């Protein structure tokens, strides 16, 4: 059940996600790799793809925070909080890499955050089985989208590739965690709707 303390924590988390630089406890993947020379076209492509990945992490933060607010089981809430901390690291990694590439973050991050937070709240209200099932499916789709980015990133952009590779590993772990905690299999129409929404987000974030 929602209470004032949880709402304050949620509001603080939203401000930190959208306005404050993200922090990471783990070393940034690829930080010791060489910064190979990229053409302007390659830099723009890498920056756009990393912007999409950053938006994905903004959405993940919002989703986890919304789900944690309405989760009914303390064990589930703790698992969501742990995953959210790892997603914060992804936020920091992508943010840093965008800056290194001379790119910018999406202007629509508040919109992405608000929509994902609402989805997280709704998923949590439906109960932990569907809450975790929604999380697992989200992470599977994110993992697939990161695999696609590994195909699209310039081969010589080894720093971006190292970050995306580690993110892909972490997302797979989050999906496994959600299933192990009792996540249910979502109906096929819900999965299709999620893919459609994700496609709109990624195509928009590529440019905006």
UniProtKB/Swiss-Prot annotation:
Its needed co-factors are: Fe cation
Top-level EC class as recorded in UniProt = oxidoreductase
Q: Give the location in the cell.
A: Cell membrane
For this UniProt record, the keywords arranged alphabetically read as follows: Cell membrane, Iron, Membrane, Metal-binding, Monooxygenase, Oxidoreductase, Ubiquinone biosynthesis
Entry GO MF terms:
3-demethoxyubiquinol 3-hydroxylase activity; metal ion binding
What is its membrane topology? Peripheral membrane protein
Q: Which SUPFAM superfamilies match?
A: Ferritin-like (SSF47240)
Which positions are annotated as binding Fe cation 2?
A: 87, 139, 171, 174
EC code = 1.14.99.60
Specify the superkingdom: Bacteria
* Pathway this chain belongs to: Cofactor biosynthesis; ubiquinone biosynthesis
CDD domains xrefs: DMQH
Q: Where are the transmembrane segments?
A: none
Q: How is the cofactor bound?
A: Binds 2 iron ions per subunit.
| HAMAP family listed in its UniProt record | COQ7
User: Of which family is this protein a member?
Assistant: Belongs to the COQ7 family.
Role according to the record: Catalyzes the hydroxylation of 2-nonaprenyl-3-methyl-6-methoxy-1,4-benzoquinol during ubiquinone biosynthesis.
According to UniProt, the name of this protein is 3-demethoxyubiquinol 3-hydroxylase
What species does this protein belong to?
A: Nitrosomonas europaea (strain ATCC 19718 / CIP 103999 / KCTC 2705 / NBRC 14298)
């Amino acid at each position: 059940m929602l209470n004032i303390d949880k709402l304050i924590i949620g509001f603080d988390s939203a401000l930190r996600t959208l306005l404050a630089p993200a922090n990471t406890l783990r070393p940034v993947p690829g930080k010791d790799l060489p910064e190979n020379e990229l053409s302007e076209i390659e830099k723009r492509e890498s920056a756009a793809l990393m912007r999409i990945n950053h938006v994905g992490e903004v959405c993940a933060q919002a989703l986890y925070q919304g789900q944690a607010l309405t989760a009914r089981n303390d064990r589930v809430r703790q698992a969501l909080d742990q995953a959210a901390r790892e997603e914060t690291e992804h936020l920091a990694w992508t943010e840093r890499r965008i800056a290194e590439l001379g790119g910018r973050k999406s202007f629509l991050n508040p919109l992405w955050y608000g929509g994902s937070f609402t989805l997280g709240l709704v998923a949590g209200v439906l109960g932990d089985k569907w809450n975790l099932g929604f999380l697992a499916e989200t992470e599977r789709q994110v993992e697939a989208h990161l695999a696609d980015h590994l195909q699209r990133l310039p081969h010589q952009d080894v720093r971006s590739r190292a970050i995306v590779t580690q993110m892909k590993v972490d997302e797979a772990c989050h999906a496994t965690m959600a299933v192990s905690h009792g996540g249910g299999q979502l109906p096929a129409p819900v999965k299709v709707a999620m893919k459609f929404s994700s496609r709109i987000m990624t195509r928009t974030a590529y440019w905006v």
